[in-house]
Amino acid sequence: MFCPFCRHPDSRVVDSRTSDDGLSIRRRRQCPECGRRFSTTETASLSVIKRNGVVEPFSREKIVTGVRKACQGRPVTDTDLAVLAQRVEEAIRATGASQIEANDIGLSILPPLRELDEVAYLRFASVYQGFDSLDDFEAAIAQLRVAHAATPDADAL
């Protein structure tokens, strides 16, 4: 690793720590040439294969932006959205794949969004899964009701 101050081609790791979210490693380094210290952050790369075949880096912010639209007017905070995006990223990284299709990201958003807010879930699912009629909404609502019936302390729809 090049020193950002003197461009020396080597550095020594002084300290390594896992980040709070557990998805990256923060390393404190020292340059043997100039003696200055600097920090680096290392994360495993994760790429998204879009529907048109273009590959781009995974972005948690894109998840938040997409889900925020479904949550407009709902009692969902920015913190809730950040936690949802983190859960989605953790689920994706747990697969061990370095590339994931955009469709799979959408599928992994649905379960935590359903737990967060069922109305937002229906909005997101209606666009993502291409609901064409009231029958599609009724089927999704019926699935939510079945899930509520299976959960003893769930609120009624």
Swiss-Prot record:
Q: Which residues form the ATP-cone domain?
A: 46-136
Give a single Pfam family match. Answer: ATP-cone
InterPro entries cross-referenced by the UniProt entry: ATP-cone_dom, NrdR-like_N, RNR_NrdR-like
Q: Which GO terms describe its molecular function?
A: ATP binding; DNA binding; zinc ion binding
Q: Which cofactors is this protein said to need?
A: Zn(2+)
* Entry annotated with the keyword Coiled coil: no
The highest taxon in the source lineage is Bacteria
Q: Report the PROSITE patterns cross-referenced here.
A: ATP_CONE
Tell me one GO biological process term: negative regulation of DNA-templated transcription
TM segments? Answer: none
For this UniProt record, the keywords arranged alphabetically read as follows: ATP-binding, DNA-binding, Metal-binding, Nucleotide-binding, Repressor, Transcription, Transcription regulation, Zinc, Zinc-finger
- Cofactor detail note: Binds 1 zinc ion.
Question: Which stretches are zinc fingers (unnamed)?
Answer: 3-34
The entry assigns this protein to a family as follows:
Belongs to the NrdR family.
Task of the protein = Negatively regulates transcription of bacterial ribonucleotide reductase nrd genes and operons by binding to NrdR-boxes.
The identity of this protein, by name, is: Transcriptional repressor NrdR
Task: Please spell out the taxonomic lineage of the organism that makes this protein.
Answer: Bacteria, Bacillati, Actinomycetota, Actinomycetes, Micrococcales
